[in-house]
């Protein structure tokens, strides 16, 4: 095949040069690209539309260019398809080339010009703005071609002037057009300085009388902005392509596997996986033979199955190595064999036999199969942590860097390693800033909102029914039994060996209790965990899940996103990439690590608006709010002085049914001030803050006033002596049946309440609606004479309390449905994970024991942190004063003492703080409503009691006086702090062993006995001694488990015991 030096395009064989129509396929021509450029001619770039008009109208554009001189014929070369580039004839040296070319040019000029004119392809028509045919690319005055030398100085000079707004200039460049003129030949050497343009033809951008350069600059700007994300583009077609991201439309579909894409380039890249594959074989490979139950030997593969290739490539087949059967007949779960590197044209695709992912190279397949085998070949040299990918190891090594730069947020103090993450984080603080509020995309079905349209589309797919369920057969074929699910052969997580020792048997029995209590539909989607192929009704096939694109190759669970599948695979591989820098504990998810940080910071940013209780997690606050949202019936609401539950007439009458649909059917709370209705008590309490200016709710018994109805409710319960006093005599329309007394709480609740509301209030009041409990709680709480103070006992677990308010608060624990019970102590839990965590408390041994005090820990990181208490090790030291700390968090807090910096500023009152936690705590003060205002100074308070205490400063009243000197104080805390000065100084008792100081001689004697090997803490039941209170508390739990019924006791056989 010969290339056309004139650049006409055709080169034979269906392939062309760069200047042709199709372009050279460089994957099929592995010759030197620079050598190819020296002997090819390129057509000048043509400008169309607005750009051509703007360039042609430049004031420095002269008339038509001069005619080029005749061109000498260059030598012809062969370009074999699969060989390196070699010239057809040897190129002479520079000394001989000039003489030979000059002597032969006169003899062959006529013939070469005629032949080249016959072989040259006619030039395409130019736009009217140019008005002349394009000139040749190179100048004939340039020297003859030099082998393998390419100079870019002329190219840089040409495009450098275009960027500066001036004309295209250079050797042989026609002014105003930007195309060089001359015969073909290489560019000048770097030592040769190309001559510049004439002074008359120079363009001055400052003398832009007609606005040509402004017009050209306008055309180069991005004038097509996106109305959703404000991103701009130069061309309208790019904007149209970008809008597919927001609309979620995927118009480009693969004809082999049916996957859709929003960009044509993504579809082109995807089609490489289906190279040389017929459409019938483009789908996922067929699942392998049926898997036997876990623990049983796998059947030997047939000859046909073993010979079938696992890839769909037309090249050398990449057959995975089948697991060889062992001596006892069981198949060894060996790793999946990796095909050898393909030589020649076999560049894939290679399919994974477990998850059906397709890869182009066998090395990529081998790297992917590490996920299934659980192998981690890359380990850290500092902490010995291992990873399955080299990129993960590089990312982890950066965490050990001492001088790692962290950029703190000026608002909340959170630090980031990347400036881009910090900018995104600060944009979240800005909210509705300069860019306006963020767009919200709500769901029309459930009302849930999302910040991105793609998330809304994925959410709507969950509402849509599966296609298989929508198109059910009408001929009764659906009732036919479904075949058991099949899975591809490969390494799976097999169960451990049968237990041999007593401890292993006990652990296996505990696991059987946990998984035996889990409902079958929960584990039906994981047939491999059940030890068999699974049932068709419970779990279905793991090979394909309706509506799920990405399926797990180990358990068959389907997911809608690839990222979710990757996070799920960590459950099988055991990878925990997120580590706490304080205690070393690891987590699979990053949000688990964020929740864990609250343990070290002890920050409780979530506060209940009604009772003021604070929590560290939003889930805890949500569960706590259910206490305030409990809907009270008419009987208890009238006793507590609360707004009664409004419902249909006769809802609390004798005709009310005991099987109501639920607590929210026809029930609502009404505001007594404005009459607005709310679904539960929590919302009406929040609404009451609008009407509150003082404390309008007073107690009839003691006259104490409250600003919240909920606080009045809890206060009135304190005045009740027994639970039966909460239930007043039944009204005329509510007579107890069977002639029982009106104070029988169980009868009143059975007939006057409906459904779950009555059951919940009955549990709160300590009674039960059934016949098994009767009035046991009432008798145990208030009835019966006892020698000590009156205590209130729980009828469910037998725990007793000194105050009735404590019993009411405790009753909420039993309102949560707990279906999983511990076989050792009988304690019940709502989830299997909570039960697994509880099982740890019954283990006799822990893996890591302290050699000094004998304390055991679950993890090595906890033991290492504990041993610092014995060695007085302080690994984190201050560089200013040299003080050591046990935690790095303590050192960061201590550094503020030396710097005095207060980097965290409140945006409301401009008050500054040294710690981010202090600023977060201060901001919550601005968020809380403060309706109580001082008339003297204008200071506001949340409660009226705080306002009255503050007004003493203006009145000069000192209500608190010291008993010793009679000095008066405004606040109680001030007088308590003052009275410490009158107390005699106590001698300091310091331990000679650990230098710990004590003020109480009793504690000091017990501490010395612990150093001497004594056990001063004795159990009152069995007399066993312990060195510390921690061991004694753990020992008492064992006695409590024995008293509750032992291992065979269930959740309903708990014996009563005082708290």
Swiss-Prot record:
Gene Ontology terms, MF aspect: DNA-binding transcription factor activity; RNA polymerase II cis-regulatory region sequence-specific DNA binding; zinc ion binding
Cross-link (Glycyl lysine isopeptide (Lys-Gly) (interchain with G-Cter in SUMO2)): 802, 1040
GO cellular component, one term: nucleus
Spans annotated as Disordered: 1-24, 58-142, 161-206, 275-342, 461-503, 726-747
Sequence ranges of Pro residues compositional bias: 61-78, 124-137, 183-198, 281-296, 481-499
UniProt keywords, alphabetically: DNA-binding, Isopeptide bond, Metal-binding, Nucleus, Repeat, Transcription, Transcription regulation, Ubl conjugation, Zinc, Zinc-finger
Zinc finger (C2H2-type): 224-246, 252-274, 350-372, 378-400, 407-429, 441-463, 550-572, 578-600, 606-628, 669-691, 697-719, 792-814, 820-842, 848-870, 876-898, 904-926, 932-954, 960-982, 989-1011, 1017-1039
Xref: PROSITE patterns: ZINC_FINGER_C2H2_1, ZINC_FINGER_C2H2_2
Compositional bias ranges of the Gly residues kind: 8-21
Location in or out of the cell: Nucleus
Any single biological process term in GO: regulation of transcription by RNA polymerase II
Comp. bias regions, Low complexity: 93-119, 297-316, 324-337, 463-480
Chief location of this protein within or outside the cell: nucleus
Biological role: May be involved in transcriptional regulation.
Family named by the database record: Belongs to the krueppel C2H2-type zinc-finger protein family.
Protein name (database record): Zinc finger protein 865
Organism (species): Homo sapiens
Classification lineage: Eukaryota, Metazoa, Chordata, Craniata, Vertebrata
